[in-house]
């Protein structure tokens, strides 16, 4: 009998896993990693993308084993590229490897979330400050136009368009920093916090609040007020951290990033 690529832990069955919207998951992956893709993707690249989408778009929050044999069979590849893809995901922080028990979906602790988002906040604020003098006002206005388009459609819950708007602003600021090492570190962090960004689309009020934050950041940058933009970005990321902690751990003292 063939094993499931994601095996249930001893506590129960994998019965609540979300069915992946292939179009949306492909768009999200392309938005995040399209600029880093090889011109001709390898078999490992393909396996990595498919497993990444499975992890990011799953609602399951239990520790589960990832079978390289079953994944290889499901994806139509040999075991070696499936294993190499899992090893890459270990480096990205989405999977953990146990020498005796194989590969497992990483379960984030509250301390992990604090560390990820605190580091993200510090690095993205630095990226904004480095990027600000180089930013083209036309790019900022284009981002505002996209934001207003998303806002007009909020009642329709435009998941894809919202994520596009969200990822594009952060990517614009990070890449415009011109600091290769900073971009590299944030790319690795993004592998970890992107799954929480995707899950935020389940909360329309959070999407609305995030758009409000983005608008204020963009207007501050267009007005040449870099200090204000940096302060707003830091608060935006702190709110995102509070939401993740409240969602996963019900941590008290974390204000919800939702409007009443």
PLM-predicted stretches and their roles:
Residues 56-57, 178, 222-223:
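Residues at helix-coil transition
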Residues 64, 97, 166, 209-211:
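Short, flexible turn/loop "capping" segments at secondary-structure junctions
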Residues 91-96, 189-191, 206-208:
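Mobile beta-alpha loop/short-helix "lid" or hinge segments that flank ligand
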